[in-house]
Structure formats: C-alpha cells, structure tokens
C-alpha cells in the first residue's frame, strides 16, 4: 500500500527526531544516503520482505535485521524498517528515507543540488562549483553531477529553487531572444 504524503512525512519526522535527540544526525546522513542508494530499483528485495502468512512475516523481519545490522546500520533505522515490513509498507521506504534525508540536511544547513554538464566532472571541478554555489546561497551545497548532452558545453546548476545556467545552450537561447526583440 502506498502511503499518503503526510504519513510519509510523519515517519520521516519521527526518525529525524530520534536522530537529533540521540545526536546521530551526521551518522544518519551517511546511513540514510546509503539506504536510499542501496534500495534503488530493488523490486526483488521488496518481494523478499512481502509476506502472506506468519512464517513469511518472521522470515521477512529476519531478512531486514540480518541484512542491515551486518552493515552496521543504526538500530533505530533497522527497527523502522522492520515496522514497515510488519505493516506491509516496505514499498514506501525510499520515499520516507528521501524525506528524512532532506530534513537531516536542512538541520545541518546543507542543500542538495544537481550540476548538469556534457561530460562527467572531476572531483576538483565539482568541489570548485560547490564552493562557488555555497557562497551564493549561504549554505553548504552537495551536488550530484548529471550528464546532459543538450547543453552543448558549459554547466547548469540547480539548487533549491535557483538555477545558475552557464551552458552554451542557454547563452544561444539568450542571444536568439535578444535578436528577436
């Protein structure tokens, strides 16, 4: 069953409050990011933790416990995953974790963004862009590099509701617009 947005937010808020209270925010940022990535496109795993009888339910909960405790995930996160399995709501896990991740980053005054380029950027380039954008938005910025061959050249950065477009495509469009007026 897919949960409503408010219920997803409630789960995320509960986990966020635990992270703050237990002083685990930094750990949760790392662990939640890893969970989001590891559960991407894992329909087989969702099927493993779906059940139709008590024995399968016990197995599903054991799978969660064994899988995630072996990687050192926090017990509160594991228990939340087990609750989702028990209530047959595991399919909502990534949505809950994404909301939680945003709350954790906001708490640390960090924002997520994307930098679009025609080819993969080096770590040095990415760090230089992060620094420049961080200064513009007055927050620490974490960027994900996404490839967009339509840009022709240059980069486009999207952070919060702001877009910083230094691509050749944008410059050509601006020039075209200027010529039409």
From Swiss-Prot:
User: What is this protein for, i.e. what is its function?
Assistant: F(1)F(0) ATP synthase produces ATP from ADP in the presence of a proton or sodium gradient. F-type ATPases consist of two structural domains, F(1) containing the extramembraneous catalytic core and F(0) containing the membrane proton channel, linked together by a central stalk and a peripheral stalk. During catalysis, ATP synthesis in the catalytic domain of F(1) is coupled via a rotary mechanism of the central stalk subunits to proton translocation. This protein is part of the stalk that links CF(0) to CF(1). It either transmits conformational changes from CF(0) to CF(1) or is implicated in proton conduction.
NCBIfam families listed in its UniProt record: ATP_synt_delta, PRK13436.1
The entry's protein name is: ATP synthase subunit delta
UniProt entry tagged with the keyword Transmembrane: no
User: Belongs to which family?
Assistant: Belongs to the ATPase delta chain family.
Give the top-rank taxon of the lineage listed in the UniProt record for this protein. Bacteria
Q: How does it assemble?
A: F-type ATPases have 2 components, F(1) - the catalytic core - and F(0) - the membrane proton channel. F(1) has five subunits: alpha(3), beta(3), gamma(1), delta(1), epsilon(1). F(0) has three main subunits: a(1), b(2) and c(10-14). The alpha and beta chains form an alternating ring which encloses part of the gamma chain. F(1) is attached to F(0) by a central stalk formed by the gamma and epsilon chains, while a peripheral stalk is formed by the delta and b chains.
Species lineage: Bacteria, Bacillati, Mycoplasmatota, Mollicutes, Mycoplasmataceae
**Keyword Cell membrane on entry:** yes
Its annotated compartments are: Cell membrane
| Swiss-Prot/TrEMBL keywords | ATP synthesis, Cell membrane, CF(1), Hydrogen ion transport, Ion transport, Membrane, Transport
Q: Where does this chain mainly localize?
A: membrane
* Matching PANTHER family: ATP SYNTHASE DELTA CHAIN (PTHR11910)
What InterPro entries does UniProt report for this protein, alphabetically?
ATP_synth_OSCP/delta_N_sf, ATPase_OSCP/dsu
Q: Name one GO cellular component term.
A: proton-transporting ATP synthase complex
- Any one GO MF annotation of this record: proton-transporting ATP synthase activity, rotational mechanism
Q: How does it sit in the membrane?
A: Peripheral membrane protein
Native source species: Mycoplasma mycoides subsp. mycoides SC (strain CCUG 32753 / NCTC 10114 / PG1)
């Amino acid at each position: 069953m897919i949960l409503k947005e408010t219920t997803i937010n409630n789960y995320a808020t509960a986990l966020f409050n635990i992270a703050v209270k237990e002083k685990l925010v930094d750990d949760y940022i790392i662990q939640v990011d890893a969970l989001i990535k590891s559960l991407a496109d894992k329909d087989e795993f969702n099927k493993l933790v779906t059940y139709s009888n008590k024995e399968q339910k016990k197995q599903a909960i054991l799978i969660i416990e064994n899988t995630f405790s072996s990687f050192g995930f926090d017990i509160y996160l594991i228990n939340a995953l087990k609750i989702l399995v028990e209530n047959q709501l595991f399919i909502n896990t990534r949505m809950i974790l994404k909301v939680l991740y945003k709350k954790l980053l906001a708490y640390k005054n960090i924002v997520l963004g994307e930098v679009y380029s025609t080819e993969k950027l080096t770590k040095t380039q990415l760090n230089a862009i992060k620094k420049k954008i961080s200064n513009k938005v007055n927050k620490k910025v974490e960027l994900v590099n996404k490839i967009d061959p339509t840009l022709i050249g240059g980069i486009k950065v999207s952070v919060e509701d702001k877009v910083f477009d230094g691509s050749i495509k944008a410059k050509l469009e601006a020039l075209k617009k200027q010529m039409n007026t």
